[in-house]
Amino acid sequence: MGNNTESVATKAAKIKDLSKVIRVDADHLDHLLAEDAARIIEIISEEYQVILAAHSWYSRNFLPRAAARLDIALISDVLKIEANNIYTRAIYAGNVHARIQSNDPIQLLTVHSSLFEPISNEGGNAQIIIKDAPLPLNLTSWQSEKINKSDRPALTDAKIVISGGRSLGSEENFNNVLSPLVDEVGAALGATRAAVDAGYAPNEIQVGQTGVVVAPDLYIAVGVYGANQHVYGMKDSRVVVAINNDPDATIFQFADYGLVAYLFEAVPEMLNLIKE
């Protein structure tokens, strides 16, 4: 869905074991407003029994609208697909896993893609099917966007994520203490909601239930206490390292390795050791 999607569709067609790619292209889909995306899903759903998307900011915007148009339930936060209509999903900020059975004629899901093994982007030869886009609903209009460019890897793609909490105390400390370590190891920079709310870090790097969900090979939590909504966003990391001067910090319950130390001493020392 979108405008000028030919190259994306061609790339998607190479995914192994994929049989077809549906391409819906139109000028008015340049920014793909949520209500237009929901309408397209509604139309396409006539041919399918299961529709799923990665659990992301965008899917959480348009799929609930699509579910409402189809008069079915959206099953979000899916962690495991057990059968054709039985799923395990996260509730209560990931503290509880619920087993859900849906009897809707169409299964509409968002899944945590980081929990599933990636498939090959080569070797496929899917058929590309072009469908006409419905007329715009014109319920909302696009105003503007601001793209923050960074040489660092995206949070969702990074093998290493280093996140800072409110204990850093200021935006200056966030940049001066964490950034050198982040850049030295080629990591992505994350933040807790408390740090974002305090103005220490931008909203787009917030890790947690109301932010980005990550599952890197290594997650380093610096000055992070371990609120439920933050843990929800990083608990599936392969290895978790926590640095906090409070030995009772909740984050240590989820850490593979914990260091009880003042972050302003531990992080520079860690950086020096890595450089050596």
Protein language model annotation of sequence segments:
Residues 1-276:
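N-terminal glycine-rich FAD/FM-binding segment characteristic of electron-transfer flavoproteins
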